[in-house]
Amino acid sequence: MTTGLSNPAVREYLRVVALEYALFRQESGEWLEQYKFEALPSLNQQLDVAGISAENIGKIVETLRKGNPQRGTFVHFTNIVDLTNLSAKEPQLTAELLRGLFDESRPLAARIEAFRDRARQVMPEIRLGTPLFGYIMAAFDMVRYLLYKDETFRRITSLLGIE
């Protein structure tokens, strides 16, 4: 028995679902996320991992705040407010943590957990949700760090029989 993408029935099902979804979005006009495709390229041009420093971390966080629209946001505003407060309180640490997110010699989960752990040592109540990290990384490089909704990703991988 073939499973996952090797199963012709699954492949045809996914093709039809993708087509129907695209048609629905075009016809209904309900797809209100075009802003993401406009905001991320602009952020990618403004932000550079190599340029992260304690001296400019406030400006970087402000750029992230401004790039996160009021409606249909990438990340809840409270996470950006907390990141702003962290950068004001501990600019050196914040710059170090932000650079650490892009250290690909370590697994992504470890990088995010290290960021959270060290930030909570300074601000125990800081809110640093998963969407914040996805947004930060996509803001620096939207090609390398794609944004996707975790629930949708998990459902698709389950459907395809991918662990």
Which residue stretches match the model-derived regions?
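An N-terminal alpha-helical hairpin/helix-loop-helix interaction module that forms a charged
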Residues: 1-126, 141-163
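Contiguous, well-ordered alpha-helical segments that form the cores/surfaces of helical PPI scaffolds
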Residues: 133-140
